[in-house]
C-alpha cells in the first residue's frame, strides 16, 4: 500500500524521484538482521528531494496509517493473486519449487504448499481489520537505529551530501505537520453516458491482411 502511494508520486508531472519502494525483510548487508527499508532512486541533483519525499511518505504512514479503501484494494489484490496461483498450481515450473526450498533453507520461510496456503489465508486475510495493520506500523517504522546509505557515481562535479545535510533533511521532514493521506478513488463510470451504437458504412482492405472499418458515428 505504501508502494502504491510512492508510485502515485512517481506519476506526477514533476516526480520527486525516478523510482521508490519500501520493504520489510532482511537488512541488505546482513541476512541475520531484519529491517524496514526504503529505497529511492533520484537524479544526481535530486538526492535531497528524493530522500525528503520518501521519508515524508513513510512518516505519514507511521502517523496516520492506511485508509480502509486502500486496504480493501490491497487485500482484494492479494486474494486474487493467491487464487490465481491456486488455479495454476498444476502448471508451476520446477525452478519455482527450487527457489521456494532455497528460501526455506536460507530464510526459514514456511512452505505449506499452495493448497494449504490458499485455504489458510482465505480464512485469515478477510478477518484482519485495517486497524490491526495500522496499530502494527509504529513498531515496524520507528526513530531508533536509522541507517541512511547514499550511492552516487564517482565523477567530477558530483555534489555528495554530507552527514549533516542528510540529518537536516530527516529532521526537517520530522518537524513538518503532515496530514493524512486522501485516497482519491472515484466510483463513477469511465463514460457517463453510453454512446449510441453506430453502423459500418465502409469496409476496406488494410495493410498486413487487416480490415479497416468506417463507422457512422466516427
Name each model-derived stretch.
Residues 1-2, 218:
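Active/ligand-binding-proximal structured segments within catalytic/core domains
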Residues 7, 72-76, 80-83, 103-218:
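Proteolytic maturation boundary segments
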Residues 2-130, 145-153:
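M16 family metallopeptidases and their MPP-like homologs
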